[in-house]
Regions:
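Divalent metal-cofactor coordination and adjacent catalytic microenvironments
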Residues: 1-65
Length: 65
């Protein structure tokens, strides 16, 4: 759904040192969105545009804080 490259572009990161951290934050953000939205993988895919925005927002929040 959301790739590491999309996260890096969203956060304006162009170096690779934080890739492991970003991948971890991406997984956490996806789980948060699924939990808060009470969705499974299939439902997340049905609402892909909204879920993508929510996941990117969550990754950004986790990265900055």
């Amino acid at each position: 759904m959301v790739t590491l490259q999309e996260v890096k572009q969203y956060l304006r990161i162009d170096f690779e040192e934080e890739d492991p951290l970003l991948l971890s934050l991406l997984a956490t953000a996806k789980q948060q969105v699924m939990s808060v939205g009470r969705m499974d993988e299939a439902q997340l895919s049905e609402h892909e545009d909204t879920a993508r925005t929510a996941i990117l927002y969550a990754v950004s929040y986790l990265y900055e804080n």
